[in-house]
Swiss-Prot record:
Entry GO MF terms: ATP binding; glutamate-cysteine ligase activity; metal ion binding
Pathway: Sulfur metabolism; glutathione biosynthesis; glutathione from L-cysteine and L-glutamate: step 1/2
PANTHER family the record matches: GLUTAMATE--CYSTEINE LIGASE
GO biological process terms on file: glutathione biosynthetic process
Family listed: Belongs to the glutamate--cysteine ligase type 1 family. Type 1 subfamily.
One of the record's GO cellular component terms: cytosol
Taxonomy, superkingdom: Bacteria
Assigned EC number: 6.3.2.2
Protein name per the record: Glutamate--cysteine ligase
Length: 527
């Protein structure tokens, strides 16, 4: 164990401080496509019974009208978070009217690009802005790529913990700056070690052959309708032969919060010539919000983000600049198609131990390690189960299994501390389940997906549809209690009323609204 990690764990293990570890906050966002009874993309509008996608706090859409997003409230116990997620699934499933929630991350057989419906949010100015932003994504990256689903895991340490560490370490940073620096250090370590998550939880080794739209790739054929890589863990997180040149040069520095903010500010205010050629309007219709490298900050694709809850009308980078980092959003997790929620308690508890390890361990600046971190991540998503696979650690080759076991040995200390804080051995058990996967790659979700498909002679689509139907049956057999159902019904109707009120009460025109939105980031740069 590193000196810094051991000192911090000793400090937090003291009787007076141990309860702090029960105050970590968790939230989960789960995306999933709606599909029809044949496993094809649902072309129906978002079900009105689920409420307004603009104003509902827990049920919305991501890119497509058919790409649902379920958002839990924050909880201190991740078991409660998963309980929240299950209740959202049960309610949504009861309103789908013959449609299913698609079980894996990689999409079903998709119609042609033109026919994939972009999510709509009504006629309010903010609703129209969200729609035009998505039109811009289609223009820049294509609609097909936007139909990939994932799980986002939001995690924060208690606010009371940071002053304790700051004082113990004699830091001269302000409390806010110390907290932000600690979260950025967590992110640096996450970049170093996130390949491990891809090995343990990657669940997308195969995809529908039509997904690539005829583009060349390194993928092999499993059957007439399925492409795969034999040792892949997460094709979702690979490049899939897909590159966006505009973002290729955008590598936000995680040396400190300010440099991260500066790189995003620059990207959302720097024109990109190919986008300039298109312009923001065609035939008088908006096609993208602007012609910059990024339309908005959230367009930047990354495996983890520093976050701060925003005020109404505030942009993410403004919130970070004004009040610092509040939590992290882990964005690289595949949906496990064997699980009704796409994630379970073992995974969540391991993530907590892993993120605490990243937060409390020494985290020097990445500098030359950046390319190694990227290369390791890509190697594992494409061939993480290849026997003897070598990764790069500080410029030296190391076998994945050797490094994985060393990391799990160190993460065991944070898991043990979490178990001391909460009682029981749930985190140690979650860690043991991951050790078993390192010992036997056949236990990983990615290997299990291929094993079942081969044993049953199923294509990716057939496997995924069968899992989707099984999950639908699970939710049908476990309906919400009447009181819970009524609460969700009210949430849905309240959200519809809120959207109607928003559309009725607004004034101003859309062009002015977009200009003001763009000016908010330009104003931040000039300050």
């Amino acid at each position: 164990m590193s000196d810094l990690l051991s000192r911090r764990l000793a400090l937090l293990g003291a009787a007076a401080n141990l309860p702090l570890l029960t105050e970590c906050l968790h939230g989960i966002e789960r995306e999933c496509l709606r599909v029809d009874s044949d496993g094809k993309l649902a072309l129906t509008p978002h079900p009105r019974a689920l409420g307004s996608t603009l104003t509902h706090p827990q049920i919305t859409t991501d890119y497509s009208e058919a790409l649902l997003e379920f958002i839990t409230p924050t909880e201190t116990d991740v078991a409660d978070t998963l309980g929240d997620l299950e209740r959202i699934h049960r309610f949504a499933s009861s309103k789908l009217d013959g449609e299913y929630l698609w079980s894996p991350s990689m999409p079903c057989e998709l119609p042609d690009e033109e026919s994939i419906p972009i999510a709509r949010y009504g006629s309010s100015l903010i609703g129209r802005l969200k729609y035009v932003y998505r039109k811009g994504l289609a223009l820049r990256y294509g609609k097909t790529m936007q139909c990939i689903a994932g799980i986002h895991y939001n995690f924060s340490l208690p606010e009371r913990l940071w002053p304790l560490l700051r004082q113990a370490e004699g830091s001269e940073l302000s409390e806010r700056d110390y907290q932000s620096a600690a979260y950025i250090a967590l992110i640096r370590n996450f970049r170093r070690y996130s390949w491990l998550l891809m090995y343990l939880f990657g669940a997308s080794p195969a995809l529908d052959a039509g997904f690539l739209r005829g583009r060349p790739s390194q993928l092999e054929r499993l059957d007439e309708h399925t492409l795969y890589l034999p040792y892949a863990t997460s094709l979702r997180m690979s490049d899939l032969g897909y590159q966006n040149n505009a973002q290729a040069g955008l590598t936000p520095c995680y040396n400190d919060l300010q440099s991260y903010i500066d790189s995003l500010r620059q990207a959302v205010s720097t024109p990109y010539p190919p986008y300039e050629k298109v312009g923001t309007k065609q035939d008088g219709e908006w096609v993208q919000l602007n012609t910059n490298i990024l339309q908005i900050e959230n367009e930047y694709y990354s495996s983890i983000r520093p976050k701060r809850v925003t005020y109404t009308g505030e942009r993410p980078v403004q919130a970070l600049a004004a009040r610092g980092v509040q939590y992290v959003e882990v964005r690289c997790l595949d949906i496990n198609p064997f699980l009704p929620l796409g994630i379970d308690l073992d995974e969540a508890r391991f993530l907590d131990a892993f993120l605490l390890f990243c937060a409390f361990s020494d985290s020097p600046l990445l500098n030359g390690e950046c390319s190694d971190a990227t290369d390791n991540f890509l190697a594992v998503v494409k061939e993480g189960r290849r026997p003897g696979l070598q990764l790069q650690r500080r410029g030296q080759p190391v076998e994945l299994k050797v490094w994985a076991n060393e990391l799990l040995e160190r993460i065991a200390d944070t898991a043990a501390l979490l178990d001391r804080a909460r009682g029981g051995e749930a985190h140690a058990a979650a860690l043991a389940a991951q050790r078993a996967k390192v010992a036997d790659a056949e236990l990983t979700p990615s290997a299990q997906v291929l094993k079942v498909m081969r044993e049953r002679g199923e294509s990716f689509e057939a496997f995924s549809l069968r899992q989707s139907r099984e999950h639908a049956e699970y939710f049908r057999q476990h309906p919400l209690a009447a009181e819970e159902q009524a609460r969700f019904e009210k949430m849905a109707s309240d959200s519809l009323a809120e959207q109607t009120e928003l559309e009725r009460d607004q004034d101003g025109d859309f062009d002015t609204f977009v200009a003001a939105y763009q000016a908010s980031i330009l104003g931040l740069i000039s300050n």
